[in-house]
């Protein structure tokens, strides 16, 4: 064995053993660290040897990724002990964020995927403890989500299980669900369709946990997730949801900041309990809150509010915005205004089927729907085709519901609300149902009875149509009015202002209508008013109705639920008075004044001369100490609001003071309402200004971008024009060249024809001369191509022939431009030699033209030259065409 292997690693210091090459040495070092952390829980702030592992997360980042699985397991156990030791004293700061971002991904990748059960359990415990140092699970989940894109199924399943455990342990406390859930659910369909069964199983568990922590909100999952899953998976999820029940998920763990707040709250409550227990004779029997109210057996150590109910999520705000104005069908404007009803209906159906029905949320910013809603309003009000009216009403309802407020502005309401009221005259069920839904949807977002009074114009339109001459319109508008009163949750101050002069007279007309169906709706309307304002308000009005109608109204009143303003308790009446106008205050004060008077009159000690009223309002007698003790005991059972001094109330209960108080309350309430209205208007104006400025900036940027694009397009166009001109010049040159070549060819052909004719003429003339003896001066040695002098001597004639042959050979290699000259220079010289080898003139004169050998040879030679010329001309043409094609 070598010297290095014989070293006893147990003698090495801890720092060296933590990085020693033998895994057993590292294992023992990790165990020693774990024991050190456990023994130093109460004194970790003073021990620098422990602080270094907390301050430098890279140390344990190396330990928990140990190559040996046994040593790695012990390193993760030591890390868990380290986190437990520092968790209680660790405050929320950037260092905690560094620890989480450094250790969590390593624990997921190396710990949760381990084959050892203890390693996986301890890794999950470390991840949860690290998340407890944060304020929410957002960062931890964001660190785990990238593992969903990995290829290893074991790692993907571990990541899905990690997110599930985080949500089950901490819930959605301090989580911005509007951004958190869409980012998480974006990866779920891919995981649900994974090829590995374990991944799919963990994904289903994660979906069920999301359902639980969102307060059993299945609508959220249906809108965002279910359409991306397989039908069988959706069916299985519904079965799992049914097993969960109606109880929302409760968190198992608390963040460290929650633990500190809960401990602080408990200590404060304990101090308050000790400080205020002296108010009771039986010390410690009752608990009193900070307002002095008695706590009747309430638990002070209640869990956080997050464990009491699920998170309320606005599903609509999480949906992606879509645009529809850029998806209008082709020629929509022309087709929708066509005189043919089929064209109008087809345009509406095409837009509804392809765009509107598929839309989940409409974009409101930088989109103007006035033109589209104006078209729908015109169709609803004027179109004779009820199918087009129904489609337009459905479209209006969907646009209103997908824009909501403030996207569906009051300007849009004015375009469609009155046309819808006018068209309630339709009796076909499908049409009138579409109109009803559209009206109810608009009133859902713009309540005609809102206490702010901004929608009083809508209330006036409804009341005006309740007096319409058409019975169907009266009935439908009365039903809409009843629905608005039933759904009102903001008080009835607006209805109170219109009650005496407009609402009651119109309702009386409806009650006295000639048609039974309309009267029944009128009875319901009157009954709702009685439920809201009380029977005493309408005593005189009911006297003008016959007994049968009064009976019908009373029966209807019994079937209706109670409304907030009609509540009989003094507390609810006082709370309602804070939100109502002066007329409501008078009415409610008159009703609520009965209760105190009865309590005073029913007291058995009222007529006792020895009795007296104590400052807290309870009646006591000096001769009955037991009664005094009972009253002293009952003091703590009264709330602080009931401890007002009745002497002041009785002394200031004159009619004059009541009127002044009511007047002051009315003025104060009016000023408060005006202030609220002005504040809202100011905010809306500021928002509009900001939106206008933003829109202006966007338009300026877009304008600059378009200008740059225009400049680029112009420069490209100029370049293309220059290239086009150059191409045109090249084409013109090539065309001219082709024309010149064609002319040359044509001239050559003409010259060849001439030469041929000349040869034929010479042959004929020589045939005539053959029978005669011709003088040498008149004999031509050329057969039609070129004439020679008859007086040439033999030597000169031979020299001329030699020169002409040389010239012919030289010219045969010249360019095609010399073709006419070369054709003219062609010579045919047939001659015969005598015995001495010299041709004489007499021999030429004695030519036997019956022997056609010489003429045939000359003709063949001319034909060969002609064919050669034609072949060269064709090659020249082909070459010119190729050059023209290449240039183009």
Swiss-Prot record:
It comes from the Eukaryota. The modification Phosphoserine is found at residues 2, 277, 813. Keywords: Centromere, Chromosome, Coiled coil, Cytoplasm, Cytoskeleton, Kinetochore, Microtubule, Phosphoprotein, Repeat. It is found in: Cytoplasm, Cytoskeleton, Microtubule organizing center, Spindle pole body; Cytoplasm, Cytoskeleton, Spindle; Chromosome, Centromere, Kinetochore. Changing residue 519 to A: Disrupts interaction with tubulin heterodimer. No effect on polymerase activity under normal conditions but impairs polymerase activity under microtubule stress. Residues 756-780 are annotated as: Disordered. Its main location: cytoplasm. GO terms for molecular function: microtubule binding; microtubule plus end polymerase; microtubule plus-end binding. Residues 654-762 form a coiled coil. HEAT repeats lie at residues 51-88, 175-216, 411-448, 453-490, 503-541. Residues 765-780 have a biased composition (Low complexity). One of its GO terms (cellular component) is cell cortex. Binds to the plus end of microtubules and regulates microtubule dynamics and microtubule organization. May play a role in the attachment, organization, and/or dynamics of microtubule ends at the spindle pole body. Stabilizes both cytoplasmic and nuclear microtubules. Promotes mitotic spindle elongation in anaphase. Has microtubule polymerase activity by accelerating microtubule growth and inhibiting catastrophe. Binds to microtubules. Homodimer; each monomer can bind via its TOG domains to two alpha/beta-tubulin heterodimers. Interacts with SPC72. Associates with the NDC80 complex. Belongs to the TOG/XMAP215 family. Mutations in STU2 suppress a cold-sensitive mutation in TUB2. This is Protein STU2. The gene is STU2.
């Amino acid at each position: 064995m070598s010297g290095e292997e014989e070293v006893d690693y147990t003698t090495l210091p801890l720092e060296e053993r933590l990085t020693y090459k033998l895994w057993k040495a590292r294992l023992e070092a990790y165990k020693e660290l774990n024991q050190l952390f456990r023994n130093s829980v109460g004194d970790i702030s003073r021990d620098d040897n422990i602080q270094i592992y907390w301050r430098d997360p890279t140390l344990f980042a190396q330990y928990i990724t140990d190559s040996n699985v046994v040593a790695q397991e012990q390193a993760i156990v030591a890390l868990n002990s380290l986190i437990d030791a520092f968790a209680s004293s660790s405050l929320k700061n950037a260092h905690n964020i560094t620890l989480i971002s450094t250790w969590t991904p390593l624990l997921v990748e190396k710990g949760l995927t381990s084959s050892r059960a203890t390693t996986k359990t301890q890794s999950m415990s470390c991840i949860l403890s690290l998340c407890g140092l944060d304020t929410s699970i957002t960062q931890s989940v964001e660190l785990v989500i990238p593992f969903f894109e990995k290829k290893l199924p074991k790692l993907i399943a571990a990541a899905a299980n990690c997110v599930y455990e985080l949500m089950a342990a901490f819930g959605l406390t301090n989580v911005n669900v509007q951004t958190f859930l869409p980012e998480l659910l974006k990866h779920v369909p891919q995981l649900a369709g994974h090829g590995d069964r374990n991944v799919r199983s963990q994904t289903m568990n994660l979906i069920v946990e999301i359902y639980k922590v969102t307060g059993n909100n299945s609508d959220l999952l249906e809108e965002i997730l279910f359409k991306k899953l397989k039908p069988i998976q959706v069916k299985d999820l519904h079965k799992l949801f049914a097993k969960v029940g109606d109880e929302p998920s409760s968190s198992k763990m608390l963040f460290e900041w929650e633990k500190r707040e809960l401990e602080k709250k408990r200590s404060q409550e304990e101090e308050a309990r000790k400080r205020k227990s002296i108010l009771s004779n039986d010390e410690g029997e009752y608990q009193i809150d900070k307002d002095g109210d008695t706590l009747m057996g309430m638990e002070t150590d209640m869990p956080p509010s997050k464990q009491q109910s699920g998170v309320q999520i606005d599903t609509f705000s999480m949906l992606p915005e879509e645009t529809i104005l850029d998806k209008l069908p082709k020629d929509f404007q022309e087709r929708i205004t066509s005189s043919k009803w089929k064209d109008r209906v087809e345009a509406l159906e095409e837009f509804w089927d392809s765009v509107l029905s598929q839309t989940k949320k409409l974009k409101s910013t930088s989109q103007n729907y006035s033109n589209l809603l104006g078209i729908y309003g015109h169709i609803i009000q004027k179109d004779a085709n009820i199918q087009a009216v129904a489609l337009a009403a459905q479209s209006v309802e969907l646009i209103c519901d997908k824009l909501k407020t403030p996207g569906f502005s009051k300007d849009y309401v004015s375009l469609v609300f009155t046309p819808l009221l006018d068209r309630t005259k339709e009796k076909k069920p499908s049409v009138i149902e579409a109109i009803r839904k559209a009206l109810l949807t608009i009133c859902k977002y713009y309540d005609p009875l809102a206490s702010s009074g901004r929608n009083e114009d809508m209330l006036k339109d409804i009341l005006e149509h309740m007096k319409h001459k058409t019975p169907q319109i009266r009935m439908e508008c009365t039903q809409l009015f009843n629905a608005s009163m039933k759904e009102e949750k903001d008080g009835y101050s607006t209805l109170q202002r219109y009650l005496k002069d407009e609402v009651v007279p119109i309702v009386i007309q409806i009650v006295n209508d000639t048609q039974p169906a309309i009267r029944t709706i009128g009875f319901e309307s009157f009954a709702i008013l009685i439920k809201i304002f009380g029977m005493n308000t309408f005593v005189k009005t009911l006297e003008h109705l016959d007994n049968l109608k009064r009976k019908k109204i009373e029966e209807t009143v019994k079937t209706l639920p109670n409304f907030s303003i009609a509540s009989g308790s003094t507390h609810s009446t006082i709370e309602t008075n804070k939100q109502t106008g002066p007329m409501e205050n008078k009415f409610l004060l008159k009703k609520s004044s009965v209760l105190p008077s009865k309590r005073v009159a029913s007291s058995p000690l009222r007529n006792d001369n020895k009795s007296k009223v104590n400052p807290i309002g309870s009646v006591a007698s000096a001769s009955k100490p037991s009664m005094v003790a009972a009253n002293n005991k009952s003091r703590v059972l009264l709330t602080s609001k009931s401890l007002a001094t009745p002497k002041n109330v009785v002394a200031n209960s004159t009619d004059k003071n009541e009127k002044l108080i009511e007047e002051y309350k009315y003025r104060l309430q009016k000023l408060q309402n005006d202030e609220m209205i002005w504040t809202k208007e100011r905010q809306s104006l500021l928002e509009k200004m900001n939106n206008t400025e933003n829109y202006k900036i966007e338009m300026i940027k877009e304008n600059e971008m378009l200008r740059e694009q225009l400049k680029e397009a112009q420069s490209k166009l100029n370049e293309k024009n220059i290239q086009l001109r150059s191409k045109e010049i090249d084409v013109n040159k090539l065309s001219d060249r082709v024309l010149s070549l064609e002319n040359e060819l044509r001239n050559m052909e003409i010259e060849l024809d001439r030469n041929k004719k000349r040869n034929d003429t010479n042959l004929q003339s020589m045939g005539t001369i053959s029978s005669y003896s011709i003088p040498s001066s008149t004999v031509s040695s050329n057969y039609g191509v070129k004439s020679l002098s008859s007086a040439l001597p033999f030597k000169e004639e031979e020299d001329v022939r030699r020169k002409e042959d040389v010239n012919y050979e030289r010219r045969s290699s010249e360019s095609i431009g010399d073709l006419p000259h070369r054709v003219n220079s062609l010579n045919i010289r047939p001659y015969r030699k005598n015995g001495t080898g010299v041709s004489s003139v007499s021999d030429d004169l004695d030519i036997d033209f019956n022997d056609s050998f010489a003429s045939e040879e000359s003709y063949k030679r001319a034909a060969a030259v002609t064919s050669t010329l034609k072949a060269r001309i064709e090659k020249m043409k082909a070459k010119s065409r190729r050059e023209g094609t290449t240039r183009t």
